[in-house]
Every structure is written in C-alpha cells, then in structure tokens.
Amino acid sequence: VIESHADARYSFGKFKKKHFGPSGSWEAQVCELPNLRHLRVFQAVARLGSISGASREARVSQPAVTQGIAKLEAMLDVVLFERRQSGCYLTEYGRAYLARTDRMFAEMEGGLVAPRVGPPFADDKSLKSILAKTTATHVRALMAVAEHRSIETAALKLGISASSLTRAARDLEGVLRRTLFHPGLQGLTPTKPATELARRFGLACRELTYATEEIATLKGMSTSRVVIGTLPLFPVDLIARSVDDVLRIYPGTRVLVVEGAYLSLLDDLRAGKIDFLVSVLRRPNWAEDVDEEPLFRDPYAIVARRGHPLSRCRNITLQDLARFEWVLPELGTPRRMAFEHMFAGFSPKPKTSIETRSIEFQRGMLSTSDRVSIVTRQETMLEERIGALAALPFAPPVSRNADGIATRANWRPTIVQLAFLDLLRRNSRDILSIPQSAVPSSDQRGQVTPRWPALPVTGPAKRRERALVGAMPRS
C-alpha cells in the first residue's frame, strides 16, 4: 500500500499481504486499516450529505472523493451511500461503518491528546494537522515495532528490510515531533509513550475490524470472531454452553478461547487482543479503562482424591487439614491468598512445595497421593463428574470475589458479541448465588452494554436468534 505524501518513499505491500496472521487475528488488524484519507472523506460525505461539500472541506477534487468512496465500497462489498439528486444518504451498511469509523478516529485522537503515559502528542490546535499527516503506514509501523519490541526484530519477523520500517517509524516521529524510539540491546526500541500510543492505535484498528464483521452480520453471513480470555480454573461449563448457543444463532462465528494468567489477559484485553475477559473479578486500581460486571459467586471448597483419609471425618478442622501437603497456585493468586488467609497465624503451616495453575497437573498430584487443594464449587463438581477427586466435608472460612465479565471501558460490542454476552448472563443464572440486587439487570449493565444501541439483527440471523431464545428455559 502506498499512501499520500511521505508514503511515496516506501511501500508496505509485503508488510500488508504476507506477514500477518489470518483475518480477524490481532496482528491482522493493521492489515484491515484502509487509507485514512478515504475514511476522512467518507466521514465528510456522511456529515455534509454531498460529494461537493466533502471535496471543499477535504481540499481534494470531486473525482478523488468519489474514487475514495468507491474504494471503500469495493473493499467492503456493500453500498455505503444512496446517491440522489438531493444528496448522498447513508445506507444501513453506511451507518454501521460510519459509527465504527467515528470511534476509530476518536480512539486515535484520545491516544494523541490524552495519553495514559507521558505528555500529549497533540493539542486542540495541532490535532487536525497531525491526523491529516498520519497515514495507515505510520500506524502499521508503530504497531509492529511495539508488538515485537524493536525495529530490527519487527522487520525480521515481518520479512521486510529494517531500513523500510525505520523510515516509516522516523517519519511518524517527524509528524508527531516526538522521539518514539531509543537505542536498546536489540536496536531501536519503542519508548513507553510510543508503546501506549500503539495500543490506542490498535484499538482504533479493532473498530474497523468490528465494522466489517457487523456489515457481514447485517448481510446474513456472519463471519464474526469472538475472542474470550479466561483463567485456567474458570468453570468451563458456562463458557462451553454459551459458545454452543451462539454458534447455533450465528453458525459462521469463530470463537477463540484464550487461557492465561490474569494480568497477561488484562493486558491483552486493554490492547484489543481479546474482546472480553470472563474470570474472577479482581481489576487493579490502575486499570481505570476496564469495566467489570458480576455474574455469580462461586465459593471455595477443599478437594482431595476419592477415599482420602479425611473424607470419612464428619468434623474436619484446620488442624486436620494442616497435616497434609497442599497443591496450590503461586503467591499473589486469589486461591493462594485464600489459603494464606485460612492459615494466617497458624503454626506450623501446611507444607506447600508444589505450585501449579494446571488443572491436569493438579488432578494428577491429588489423585495419586493424600495431598489436598482449594478450588471453587464449580471446579469441584467437574472433578466429581470425572471421578478423580471429591470435596471434603469442610467449608473454607474465606470469601471469594464474584466471577463475571471484564471489558474495555466504552467498548461497543458487535451484534454477535452482544448476543454472546447475553447468553453468558442467561447461562450464569444456573450457578448464580450472588444476591440479585448485586447483579445488574439488563437495563443496569452500563459497564458492558454499549452506550449506543446495538445494530438491529435482521434477516436469517434474527430468525435463528428468536428461535433459540424462545426455546431456552427462563428463570
């Protein structure tokens, strides 16, 4: 792709087509970013309702405006405007694309004017000029370097020359009049403000990915991709049932479930690599750009192998449990903190020489020994169905945070994502033990439900949704 002004000096054709993951992956977000000038012209035509008005505002010829709109329509394979003698009017697809385009530029503007790290890159006076000079190639270059942590490593991973990537990165520095990269052990590496700006640019690109998915859904041929983050020990039944339900409504949907450590998943959520996080709610204070919605409370239980010596006891005490070795996750995790709280001031404390987050490894260590562990009630039910472990008759004297959904603040779900969230809420009622007043009702979930109404589901997808929801039991 060769864009206006500085882009005439270098091409990112290979960068775009060959070296990123499949469409819908986080890396592919940069590939789906069209010419930013075309997007700005599209906004102008939508706002002014005419080609001539947009031409005057953008200071380009009317044929250039027409060509820019035509390229967007060809890329999306839809008609964005109805052309009439009285002007240009957005179609249903055009309205969907405009909403996401507006959000994309708002995200970019926020990253430039109000970054979370370092001083602003722009103020109200310089913002318009900087946005006009920033190109899709600049965005791709910054995101690639931030992802791979150095220009040299990014160029090697992408199969392009370091000089081409360096020119794009340096040109962006000239546009912003800020140093974005500094020498490191692996060559030029991004500064912290540059890494944060790349994150905001990534979220901006994600809006256009959502736009293409919403347009496909409106056409009755959903190709949406839902990326869910979850912890290794989170109740799998809830997610599995919700995935199965959403695939019946939108058969073309691709669902990716990513397991990992909480803080790693939180970073992925904030960067737009995952759409939402389903886990125990434990947002740190610094993550002000993340919202949480409680769904249910899953209390702790103590598990051991079937036939464990304590399974025959009626009144188990902490002294009894302290005689056995424990298998636990590492320090700082909720279950480990619950264990530490249980045995606070207890001497001697139980032996804890084995640390793991792996369900399979924990099951193996417990099923072949007299070791014990602390898990949730839902995890206990799963282990009992498998037949490997059983709950001991002991109620841990510790409370547990609610489980629920974490999303980016001001996030606007796609049609399919919104359906998946509603299915999570519906299915979570089967294990709901939180007081109903503590769980937002459908009209109180401002943290997850978009501030704008979701685009209406029409055609075959709507009929499938009605059929499935009507068949579901209501609590």
PLM-predicted stretches and their roles:
Residues 45-59, 145-157:
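Short helix-boundary/capping micro-motifs
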Residues 220, 289-326, 409:
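Flexible hinge/capping segments at coil-to-helix
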Residues 115-138, 217-235, 250-253, 299:
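Interdomain hinge and pocket-entrance segments immediately C-terminal to HTH DNA-binding domains
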Residues 148, 153-163, 224-282, 475:
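Central regulatory/effector-binding core of bacterial HTH transcription factors
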